[in-house]
Design a protein with these regions (language model features):
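Short glycine-enriched nucleophile-adjacent loop
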Residues: 168-179
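N-terminal cap/lid subdomain of alpha/beta-hydrolase-fold enzymes
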Residues: 56-128, 135-138, 165, 207-209, ...
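Bacterial N-terminal signal peptides
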Residues: 8-18
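Catalytic-loop region of hydrolases
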Residues: 22-78, 90-92, 227, 233-327, ...
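Active-site nucleophile loop of the alpha/beta-hydrolase fold
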Residues: 186-195, 407-412
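Alpha/beta-hydrolase fold nucleophile elbow
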Residues: 154-165
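Short beta-strand/loop motif that positions the catalytic acidic residue
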Residues: 368-370
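Cap/lid segment of the alpha/beta-hydrolase catalytic domain
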Residues: 76, 86-153, 199, 328-341, ...
């Protein structure tokens, strides 16, 4: 063989090696159609491939997605869908999953132009509202499975979804609207009960502002109100929580009265009768003219902000978190306005159905967590949803066969600072493995480990309605949360609009 021939063979071998990740590029491109535009195909580590694709199911819809596909030799057979956060508009980093051998997909929920791009701050048109509410995640998944079939020549063995806040809502929506998409879903601090959570924000704003929109409390006063419950309960709470966090922040009315008297002693400026009335309203929530519960009220100890304290929460956030369609609240939103603007449209973005029968029937499993210090997606609305779900499905025992809820003490939302943990910082591979064990082997998670670094502890959180505590003998024990501790919002706030 001549030198020229030898060189040609070597170059051909190098080219083949360099393009091995693209061996099925032609097959991948066959997935493109009138809805799916393939924007880019490229390499990831260890001979893997990424595909950037945009979905446009109707005019005005532009859903950006990415899937990362490990090499056939490394693929675990699993697809993981990854949730977004806030209002979406970005593609998150998927390396942690694809490097572990999983096919993994995510989406910007179709909101990039309105959240990060040339239309930033503009009202969402109906097509984008629909994408964000339910369509983007489903279509991302449909096409992700097509890319998997094209790349590997076979379907995924199992499909899982994980997400928190907005991503948790995505997971709920998948289980409720598209139960065939995923076998197991891990939804932490889900922003799912959007209308009910929006009511909490409206109530907090109304209690902390006058009718002109003027703030009635200082930041220091609200910080005192957020921190006082820990000191108030330190001699009566159970181990290991006493003096650090609340084991159970669902205070009955008499306990709230005692707390407010304690707050007045802590900060005499909060002894004013009008401020006392408003602080009680923060915790006791609101009812309509017929006596129906609009919202439970914020939990004592709810944290938001760094280093901590209860925030004012703006009426602007009310509209942004639920509507994002040009609707805005007045300076002092009334409950009539809430009904008109949030309830009327909120069913489209709610992910709070009490019918998970199709998901459960096909063997789907849903693991949910919520945080006692979460002021952004308040725990009472999630607990209320789960209690309604249990009543609809024959009790907690039956419901726990397909859906388990784990309330986490000391957990705050992203952007805040929880006394034990914040947002997804508490979600580890151990939780994903627990979901996998439940789906594939039928071994349901009996605990949700919550790391408490400050005390060098890991709390073995049991599924609701149980809670864990340390006995005097130093061993973990469980007890049931009190019945009827939640002032459950009216069921109509949990309704989902049909597609």
């Amino acid at each position: 063989m001549s030198i020229r021939q030898t060189l040609a063979v070597a170059l051909a071998a190098m080219a083949l090696s360099a393009s091995s990740a693209f061996a099925d590029e032609a097959a991948i491109r066959t997935v493109g159609d009138g809805v799916c535009r393939i924007d880019k195909i490229g390499k990831i580590a260890e001979e893997g491939v990424f595909v950037d694709y945009t979905l446009s199911p109707e005019a005005g819809s532009e859903i950006r997605c990415r899937i990362e596909l490990p090499s056939a030799e490394r693929w675990t057979g699993e697809l993981w869908g990854i949730g977004s956060s806030s209002q979406g508009g970005f593609i998150g980093n998927l390396t942690a999953y694809s490097s572990g051998g999983h096919a993994v997909a995510t989406t910007d929920l179709g909101t990039y132009r309105y959240e990060k791009g040339d239309l930033r701050g503009k009202p969402w048109p109906d097509a984008v509202f629909k994408d964000y509410s339910w369509r983007a995640t489903h279509l991302m998944t449909v096409y992700a499975k097509r890319f998997i079939k094209a790349q590997y020549g076979k379907r995924e063995r199992r499909s899982y979804f994980v997400g928190g806040s907005c991503g948790g809502r995505q997971g709920f929506c998948e289980a409720m609207r598209f139960p065939e998409d995923y076998d197991g879903i891990l939804a932490y601090i889900p922003a799912s009960m959007m209308v009910a959570a929006n009511a909490q924000v409206v109530n907090l704003y109304r209690q902390t502002h006058d009718e002109t929109g003027k703030a009635l409390f200082t930041t220091n006063q609200l910080a005192c109100l957020a921190d006082a419950p820990i000191a108030y309960m330190k001699d009566r709470d159970v181990k290991p929580y006493a003096g650090s966090v609340l084991s159970n922040p669902f205070f009955p009315e008499a306990e709230i009265d005692g707390l407010l008297a304690f707050v007045a002693r802590q900060d005499p400026s909060l002894s004013d009768p009008e401020l006392q009335k408003r602080m009680k309203g923060i915790f006791m929530g609101a009812r309509d003219a017929k006596g129906r519960v609009i919202c439970h009220g914020m939990l004592p100890g709810a944290h938001h902000g760094n280093p901590g304290g209860m925030s004012f929460r703006s009426k602007g956030l009310c509209a942004a978190s639920v509507l994002r369609n040009g609707v805005s609240y007045s300076a002092y939103p009334s409950w009539e306005e809430f009904e008109e603007k949030a309830v009327a449209r909120g069913g489209e973005i709610n992910a709070s159905s009490l019918d998970l029968s199709a998901f459960a029937k096909r063997g789907g499993k849903l693991v949910v967590s919520c945080g006692w210090e979460d002021q952004t997606t308040p725990a009472p609305e999630i607990i209320a949803w789960y209690e309604y779900l249990a009543e609809r499905n024959g009790g907690f025992g039956k419901t726990q066969e397909f859906c388990r809820l784990f309330p986490l003490p000391g957990l705050a939302h992203g952007g805040g600072k929880g006394r034990i943990a914040t947002s997804g910082g508490s979600v580890k591979e151990v939780h994903r493995n627990a979901l996998r064990q439940w789906v594939e082997k039928g071994i349901a998670p009996e605990t949700y480990p919550l790391a408490w670094p400050a005390k060098n502890l890991t709390l073995p959180i049991p599924p609701y309605p149980l809670q864990c505590y340390l006995g005097d003998d130093g061993k973990w024990k469980t007890r049931r949360y009190p019945k009827c501790m939640v002032r459950r919002p009216d069921l109509r706030y949990y309704e989902m609009a049909p597609l």
